[in-house]
Amino acid sequence: VIVIDHHIAGPELPKAHSVVNPNRLDEDGAYGYLCATSVVFVVIAGMLRTLRQRGYFSTTSPAPDLLSQLDLVALATVCDVVPLVGLNRAFVRQGLKVMAQRQHHGLVKLADIAGVNEAPNVYALGFLLGPRINAAGRLGASGLGVKLLAAEDPDTAAGLALQLDDMNTERRRIEES
């Protein structure tokens, strides 16, 4: 078991093969500003580097394109409201470029419903897309956001994006009452 976290850790760590957390008491805190998704991204990047060095990948079995996932890292970074410094700033800047390529069906359909018609920016992530994804969790259906982000076809993504948009409308109605 590998535990990955970003919250400030106490003196006792979970029983696991490894606990990766830049906010452990025995860490220097240089990356304590990262959100959990960014920590996961860095861990996976390190794993891929090690696998490359050991010759695991080849022309017939290439390494996954981790950079194509930076749009998801950017979304998580902005929505977790962590400081936009250091790696966070780099992840968001590059992630917005990836998002502008409109590769992830779920983000494309959600952006379309949310009216993000131009190149995405931090405002779109934090105030238009993020709240729609988070609304499902607030209404007891947190898995819906994950399904959207993992959707592999546009039709499924469109239906999920519509559901999330409806849930966000319901969430706002509840919060206003």
Indicate where each model-derived feature is located.
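Short alpha-helices
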Residues: 15-58, 66-78
